[in-house]
Amino acid sequence: MRFVVTLFVSLCSALTAHAGQSAALERGTAIIDPLALRELDHGRLGLSGIFRPAGSSGAEITGSQLFALPAMAPVRRALDDEYDRYIARHTSSLPNESIGVGTAFDFQLFDRALLYSNDTRFVLAGIVNRMDRSYLSEANCGEIRLIYRLARMGAPEIGENAVSPRLPMTLNVVLKAKGDHEIDSNGAAITCAAIARRWLAAGDLAVTGTELAEKLVSKDGPLDLIKPENIDRIETNLQIAHAPKSAIRDFRTDYLMKVFNYNAKAQIFEQAPLENQIDRERILADEDLKRDFKTWLLDPTHFGELDRGTILIPDKFLATVAVAPTPVGFTSSDLQPAFGLVQGDGATADPVFKESDVVAALKKAADAGLTLQNIRSPAGFERRLNDVTCSGCHQTRGIGGFHFPGVDWMAAKPSNSTVVPASPHFFGDQVRRRDILTTLRDGTQPDFSRGFSSRPQSRGSTELAGTAYEDGWGALCYQQKPDAADNDISFRSWTCAEGLACQAVDKASRMGMCFVKGR
């Protein structure tokens, strides 16, 4: 595990050094300019402008004020309950390792009092277009996500080596890209094509800071269409605890994830299942649920959706909380959400899916005329089962447990920040997302499919070739066997760029990273 952590730090350092080169990848699909985000945060896209608490008059909303809102009462209760359950589970499973707030403990809890403090608030860290998810609701044209990062208020401007006031929690406000309004402020129809056109045009703007912010919220800008009434849900991601390396364990951090749907009629946020977060413990403990899940998922239609990454698993199989430990490394373990569901993990004598079940499903899909892109072997099925979950995706090529920690515009020189705003997975997926935006703008049918979280689809091979996002130094790869026929068909294309070789980290799966040959 120590080797994996060292590799991850080195990879993040390499990405930082090339942040300027990779900046173009998010053009038209995300807003990460720190100076523009600072202006937007101080305007109507600050969290107070989105939640509009009575009497706020556009002022900053503190953590205590936010969680005192009636709409947020269920969120606070749910987070407090999860804290208590997390501590109880830890005390039961690891009685010899202390847990609490502060460095004196083996597992150091995030101080939940900071959530409800007058001295903290959520600041706008980034804005992400997710119209690539419009297959879930064509009428709403997908989603726009406002990502906020918890931070201490009143902290002095930080220098290059000072500690940032930002804290390890994000609050993601997910809005419908298209709400109920049919006409924009210019009198034109609001369509998916029109929204996509605005975003792609914004990606061509060669300005920054205040000027960029003004153009983004102008009548023709993509952010003019963002309205509080379009809120669909909020998603929270909190580093609930971290354990420094010790004599008995490697470094570990746990991230707690929750989702709360907005009930417009009741005007409150209600706890909801996490999308595709398979409830492993509940399924393995219930024979009827296990049978139903197996039957549902191996149906050729659903199997094909799983392969394409467009599946939506029914709520009855899902959990309402996810804890994502990081780093998980390359070896299959119970830290991964789908561990024990597929034969071979070693976690259970009676898995949900035997290898013969997957082989039969592959044949059935082929007989039905389905061309599978990713799941072409039992190992491919197992990997996909992990990475469609919230926690499994966040464990893959993330920055800790985050995919979008955001730009630190509180830094002394935010335009030259040395902090990478998003994960390798995020940047590696931007070509696919922009391709979908382009097809939506042009009125053609998008290809909503996506590759594994570990490796982008080949549709970005030209733009991503030679980078750490695909086959460059530090990219994830599959070490080829001497006889090509013995290679796993799901991963045999995961090779390295010229001059690099795949160094396997996990000998069983042959998964590794691309490094200079001979090293």
What are these regions (language model features)?
Residues 20-361, 426, 431, 435-465, ...:
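Conserved small-residue
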Residues 378-385:
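Short, flexible, mixed-charge glycine/proline-rich loop motifs
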